[in-house]
């Protein structure tokens, strides 16, 4: 039985430079994922996840509405983005890499996450047989690879939003007995 993401104790975050001056932080409020963990052979493990793109939130409603538009995430035509691992490893202590395919707006690109294993809690108090395991995964993607567009502002001669976007997934997985 696979491990499932606990959405109440997990986060999908992103960080992007705005006018090269400040960093805008955002998150997706609704997502799910599974981890098929092979404890004897971790390289044989796999992970996949789905994010509801319409749940994007930067804390500023007009910006969030803009991010949902056709030339950005186009949430009407592409309500989800997905990630599916293709390979896991190499391992160095509690750190490893997850190689996989990220699909945004129907465009699939290979993406590698650098992952830190934060540990396991077993058994979970008051829940006999339940286990929790936490990971923090980081990557950087180029928004142009997924046709997420911004237009240059002629008056300042630059693009307001950087091409590179840092993604951080802080995940707690639960395994039921």
Residue ranges and their predicted role:
Residues 1-177:
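Low-complexity, acidic/polar, glycine-enriched regions of mature
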